[in-house]
C-alpha cells in the first residue's frame, strides 16, 4: 500500500527531485527504469503474494492432478491393482467359485429344467403341429389357399377415367362411385 506513491509519481518525485521538469521527466524516464519499479511493486504484490499463492495452489492442484493422472491412482486403478488385482482376484477367487457353483448348479438346472423343457416344447410342439395341421385342414378350405387376385387383368387409365365419368353422369352423386 506504500507503493500508492507510485500512482502519483509526479507530486513526490518531482518535489524532491525538483531539478525541474527535466528531472521529473528523468524520473518519468526512469519509470522506464521505473518500469522495473511497477514490476517491483507488481513483483512485490504479484510474485510474493499472487504467484506463491497461485503457485502453491497450482502445486496442490498439480500435485492432486499429478497423483490422480500421473501415477499412483490411475496406474493403480487402471494398472496392476484394478485390472490385475481386482478382476484377477474376483475372477480367480469369486469367479472361480462362481464358475464351480455355476457348473454344478448349472448342470443340475440344465438337466432338470432342460430335459422337461426340451421334452415339452419338442414333444408338445410336434403334437401341436400335427393337431394344428389337422385343424387347419378342417378349418381352411383348399380354395382359400388359392390366390383370389390371380384372374385379374391390368386396366388402363383411360378405362378408369371413363368408368368414373360414367358413374358421375349416371348417378349424379359424388359419393356413389362404387355403387
From Swiss-Prot:
Subcellular location: Nucleus; Cytoplasm; Cytoplasm, Cytoskeleton, Microtubule organizing center, Centrosome
GO CC term, one of those recorded: intracellular membrane-bounded organelle
Record GO biological process: cell division
Cell cycle as UniProt keyword: yes
Biased composition range(s): Polar residues: 110-122
Residues the record lists as Phosphoserine modifications: 40, 47, 72, 80, 82, 93, 104, 115, 124, 133
Disordered as annotated region, ranges: 1-135
Effect on the protein upon substituting residue 93 to A: Partially prevents phosphorylation
Involvement in disorder: Trichothiodystrophy 4, non-photosensitive: A form of trichothiodystrophy, an autosomal recessive disease characterized by sulfur-deficient brittle hair and multisystem variable abnormalities. The spectrum of clinical features varies from mild disease with only hair involvement to severe disease with cutaneous, neurologic and profound developmental defects. Ichthyosis, intellectual and developmental disabilities, decreased fertility, abnormal characteristics at birth, ocular abnormalities, short stature, and infections are common manifestations.
Assembly, per entry: Interacts with PLK1; phosphorylation-dependent.
Official protein name in the record: M-phase-specific PLK1-interacting protein
Gene label: MPLKIP
